Design a protein with these regions (language model features):
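Short, conserved charged micro-motifs
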Residues: 21-23, 82-87, 162-166, 207-213
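Vicinal oxygen chelate
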Residues: 93-150, 174-181, 188, 214-245
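N-terminal beta-strand motif that seeds the catalytic metal site of vicinal oxygen chelate
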Residues: 1-20, 75, 126-165, 197-200
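Extreme N-terminal leader/targeting regions
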Residues: 71-97
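Hydrophobic, helix-prone linear segments
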Residues: 1-50
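Conserved active-site tyrosine of GNAT-family acetyltransferases
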Residues: 22-27, 114, 164-169, 237
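Conserved short beta-strand elements that form part of the metal-binding/catalytic scaffold
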Residues: 33-69, 116-124, 169-206, 226, ...
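Short amphipathic alpha-helices in soluble, non-transmembrane regions
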Residues: 25-29, 88-93, 212-219
Length: 245
């Protein structure tokens, strides 16, 4: 992808079964703010009111639980203020693992749908060290959620890593996506068939829809007459939405 198409923001869209249970997890465990509820969708973000993640409730009549590994392996969240992670841990919500980094603590948590999130504030999350003994974190009554964070990385489980890399090759290293090779019957399931990652919305620094469409020639694309966005679908049936930041 050219310099004109640098990603400013990535917003994952996740299909969920129970909106209430998932909202409790995203707001209480991860510290997100409920920005807007509209229809089956909920827009989540931080205190700057910038959308960072969307959940869409999809009843069992339309979607089902994933069999085997999910398409979404992990979402990594980068927090601006390290001390706010301690505030989240002080709320005594269940987490999978707590880590120590140079700037402070980090943790990994699992949503009611089985989606894994790593929350940290480090320059490099690879430097995090898993803690065997978890310290006691004080409750911070004044804490009302994360001031600012962004989606740093989305890790996808794919049946063939080289095939996935070939599809995404035109984007270069401008998209915050990594791949992990796995085996699973639902890794190529239809987009709305399972409670899984259904879309990633990308806001681009400069959005030239004709140039982007040419770059992605031969792929499944949709561009409206207004040319305000471009919608592509990757080999895992995950929708990729591109628009001007």
């Amino acid at each position: 992808m050219t310099r004109n198409h640098q990603t400013i923001k990535a917003v994952p869209v996740l299909k969920t079964n129970n909106r209430r249970l998932n909202l409790e997890f995203y707001c209480q465990t991860l510290g997100m703010k409920n920005l807007l509820e509209e229809g089956p969708g909920v827009s989540l973000g931080d205190q700057t009111k910038s959308e960072r993640l969307v959940i869409e409730e999809s009843p069992g009549a339309r979607s089902r639980k994933v069999v085997g590994p999910k398409k979404l392996a992990q979402i990594t969240i980068k927090v601006e203020e390290p001390k706010e992670i301690e505030a989240l841990l002080g709320q005594a919500r269940p987490v999978l693992q707590v880590y120590q980094g140079e700037k402070g603590y980090a943790f990994k948590a699992v949503s009611p749908e089985g989606d894994i999130f790593l929350v940290h504030a480090e320059d490099d999350s690879q430097t995090l060290r898993a803690l065997e003994k978890i310290p006691v974190f004080e409750t911070q009554a004044e804490f009302t959620g994360l001031t600012q964070f962004y989606i740093e990385k989305v890790i996808l489980n794919v049946p063939n890593k080289s095939v996935a890399q070939t599809y995404y090759q035109p984007f270069g290293d401008t998209l915050p996506i990594e791949f992990k090779e796995e085996e699973g019957q639902d890794l190529l399931a239809e987009n709305a068939a399972t409670w899984d990652l259904s879309m990633i919305k990308f806001s681009l620094e400069r959005f030239d829809v004709d140039q982007l469409a040419e770059l992605l020639e031969g792929r499944d694309l949709f561009v409206p007459k207004s040319k305000k966005f471009l919608l592509a679908t990757d080999d895992s049936q995950i929708d990729l939405w591109f628009e001007q930041a």
